[in-house]
Swiss-Prot record:
Protein name: Exodeoxyribonuclease 7 small subunit
Chief subcellular location: cytoplasm
Keyword Membrane carried by entry: no
Origin organism lineage: Bacteria, Pseudomonadati, Pseudomonadota, Gammaproteobacteria, Vibrionales
One Pfam family here: Exonuc_VII_S
Chain ranges passing through the membrane: none
Organism expressing this protein natively: Vibrio cholerae serotype O1 (strain ATCC 39315 / El Tor Inaba N16961)
Top class in the EC scheme: hydrolase
SUPFAM superfamilies for this protein: XseB-like
Biological process annotations from GO: DNA catabolic process
Keywords recorded for this protein, A-Z: Cytoplasm, Exonuclease, Hydrolase, Nuclease
Length: 80
């Protein structure tokens, strides 16, 4: 079964598969070729996940900037 392209996966599915790949790579039980293939897949997943996060952050900033009454602040400054 062919793997889905990372850009076509949900963020949650991307992270789930990435976690599975990390576990497999950390086990040390893979042949070099298999480990390299999984590493390459992991890099693709990590990049796609980062793009999804960047897109979500940009969308939040746009939504907040459309509200004239709401000042923009960093996520870390939000009170818990």
């Amino acid at each position: 079964m062919a793997s889905k392209k990372p850009e076509n996966m949900s963020f949650e599915s991307t992270i789930e598969e990435l976690e599975q790949l990390v576990e497999q790579l950390e086990s040390g039980d893979l042949a070099l070729d298999e480990a390299l293939r999984k590493f390459e897949r992991g890099i693709s997943l990590a990049r796609a996940g980062q793009l999804k996060l960047d897109d979500a952050e940009q969308r939040v900033r746009i939504l907040l900037s459309n509200s004239d009454d709401a000042p923009l602040s960093d996520f870390s400054d939000v009170a818990e």
